Amino acid sequence: MDSSETEEAARMIWGAWSAGEVIPELPEGCRPLNELEGHQVQAALTRVARQDTEGWKIAATSKAGQQHINVSGPLAGRMLAKFVCPDGAEVDLSSNQMRVAEAEFVFRFWKNIPVQQDPYSLAEVLEAVDQLQLGIEIPDSRYIGFTRVGAAQLLADNACASWMILGPEVKVAWKDRDLAEHEVRVLKNGAEVAVGSGRNVLGSPLKALTWLVNDLRRRGQMLYRHQFVTTGTCVTPVPIAPGDALVADFGEFGQARMTFSSN
């Protein structure tokens, strides 16, 4: 793809996103054919939307998630500033076709992680993290048949990014805890609807975090101080509808909350 084709694809994605519409897929003249081209469209999307990348997300961190959207591994996407909300926020679902919520561990960095030749170790990544937050992601796609378009087009679609609720910071010591075994419960309208753990996220949220850092490193993209990484859903995605109230309960770590409307 040349730069004009990349820009055209980004404009089509952002046009559908901002209008609350969906498209079958990107037309052949501006369709990414591999993951590199998909990431190039994703980067152009931030310029077209005039939105900062406040953080990063990881889609398809479980085998079930990968099978659902027909990809062979996880996908990195950007959390645009406009769609990052505080704990307790209300999100409008009127244009959301996926209508699911995901409970996630979110890590925030106190320093830049520059591009380097060698892969970062878990210890190196963890040393750059100063906060663990509790999050709820509300993904979405701008494609009608998002399970069929393939990894390159899903990356162009920002790895199905949409809304992100950043809940409270975990105040208890967590770096010496086994996050893989940490239980996460989701309650919808007061009733428990899903139970999972950090093990559902590439085996561990910290493993997923390290994967994301090195995926960016491999592509020459650094992580910046104060950016966050939300590491994927710990539970089976929970169906949601306007009027629902959701709580992601991380036990002694705390809870993240949000509600849904339809305007």
Listing of model-derived features with the role each one plays in the protein:
Residues 2-204, 241, 245, 253-263:
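Catalytic-core "active-site belt" of small-molecule-metabolizing enzymes
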Residues 219, 224-227, 244-246, 254-256:
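A short pocket-lining beta-strand/turn micro-motif at the edge of beta-sheets
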